[in-house]
Regions:
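RNA-interacting cores
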Residues: 1-202
Length: 202
């Protein structure tokens, strides 16, 4: 897998437009890759923001991105290698949803308790147990597809989870890292980043 971290200038007008529209940000990320990707490729990304700065964390399985201009990304290659009982720090920005009935639309899950339950269920399916987690409400992200594709904007409820997990099933965890967790993976959700428990680096 290939991990890329790109620092963004939040004072740049183009960056401001992308940060205000999840669909525009999706298009910006995908513009770094060839139009035709291998069928088994999966591009995941996460926007990280704080006062006065922003960065994009991007993950691809096999395709290296390209770019022009004054970008100085950090690029590393990693391969998931976990073992049962291993403790790892994690970060995940997700769009917690549930199905409204057997065939109904997906609706946002709301509230700290429901978000934690959602994470626990996803962890069980993805081969890990949550040992500790902080939950941050990131609000609702909005995106606008060009007409006439969609008349209504994209609205995504975003929640960030940071904490520690224990590996239960290394193969399932590796699959979750490669392919993401939850919905809205094309719009900055689902990238599960893992690191050592004594490090803030993901």
């Amino acid at each position: 897998m290939i991990h890329i971290r790109i620092g963004l200038d939040p004072c740049n007008a183009a960056v401001q437009r992308d940060l205000a529209d999840v669909y525009a940000l999706h298009r910006r990320v995908m513009s770094l890759f060839p139009p035709q990707l291998p069928p088994d490729e999966r591009i995941l990304f996460r926007l990280e923001r704080s006062a006065g700065w922003a960065s994009l964390v991007i993950q691809s399985l096999i395709t290296r991105p390209g770019w022009a201009g004054p970008l100085h990304p950090l690029v590393i290659e990693v391969e998931p290698d976990y073992h049962p009982g291993q403790s790892l720090a994690f970060r995940l920005v997700a769009n917690p949803t549930r199905r409204d009935g057997d065939r109904g639309p997906r609706v946002a899950v709301e509230g700290q308790g429901a978000w934690r339950e959602w994470l626990a269920r996803k962890g069980d399916a993805a081969g890990f147990r949550v040992r500790d987690a902080t939950v941050a409400d990131l609000g609702t992200a909005v995106g606008y597809r060009p007409e006439p594709v969609a008349a209504r904007p994209i609205r995504l409820r975003l929640v960030r989870f940071d904490g520690a997990l224990e590996v239960a099933d290394p193969a399932r965890l590796a699959a979750a890292v490669r392919h993401g967790i939850g919905s809205a993976k094309g719009f900055g959700c689902g990238l599960l980043s893992l690191g050592q428990t004594n490090s803030n680096e993901f």
